[in-house]
Amino acid sequence: MFITFEGIDGSGKTTQSKLLANHFKQIRGENNVVLTREPGGTNFAEKVRGVLLTNNIDSISELLLLISMRREHMKKLILPALAEGKIVICDRFIDSTIAYQGYGFGVDLRLIRDLHKLVEIKYPDITFILDIDVKVGLNRAKDKNKYEEMDVNFYNKVRKGFQEIAIKEPVRCSVITGIETKNDNHVHNEIIDKIT
């Protein structure tokens, strides 16, 4: 099973990814669950991550780097783990690229999808989109990088992107709303209820 967590910065993706991984490790065993992230997940991608998050590069160049990193991530980590019957949980994946690069920066959505098809990216089985008020999310965000320096209008576009993805793909995507009014355990229990 391949599960991803999506949402704007400060929505709690990293926390919920870790909580779900720990939940499955208790059930399936430590070695049967893989927790990973994007950008990142492989040695190559982790090196490029620092460049992406701290440098302002052209939006198409950034898209191509993200897709290259994702292909490497799929081939070296995600697909082998899934082939071994492991549960893979990823903090961000393809939907973040669509929301941030497409909706936020205005890169053509068709181009983003076509490039992912070209490099044979597998979509997750389940995606949890953690929906939070933009201002609250930005106040909660822990990692300060170039994206946190973007204005509220940018994040409103990104949030709208995630919401539209969920509308277009209701079987794969499950939206957890009102994150700003719930504690981490409440959100985690909501996620567990949706999986079982």
UniProtKB/Swiss-Prot annotation:
It is an enzyme of class 2 (transferase). The keyword Isomerase does not apply. InterPro entries: P-loop_NTPase, Thymidylate_kin-like_dom, Thymidylate_kin_CS, Thymidylate_kinase. The keyword rRNA processing does not apply. GO terms for cellular component: cytosol. Keywords: ATP-binding, Kinase, Nucleotide biosynthesis, Nucleotide-binding, Transferase. GO terms for biological process: dTDP biosynthetic process; dTTP biosynthetic process; dUDP biosynthetic process. CDD domains: TMPK. GO terms for molecular function: ATP binding; dTMP kinase activity. Its EC number is 2.7.4.9. Phosphorylation of dTMP to form dTDP in both de novo and salvage pathways of dTTP synthesis. Belongs to the thymidylate kinase family. HAMAP family: Thymidylate_kinase. This is Thymidylate kinase. It comes from Wolbachia pipientis wMel.
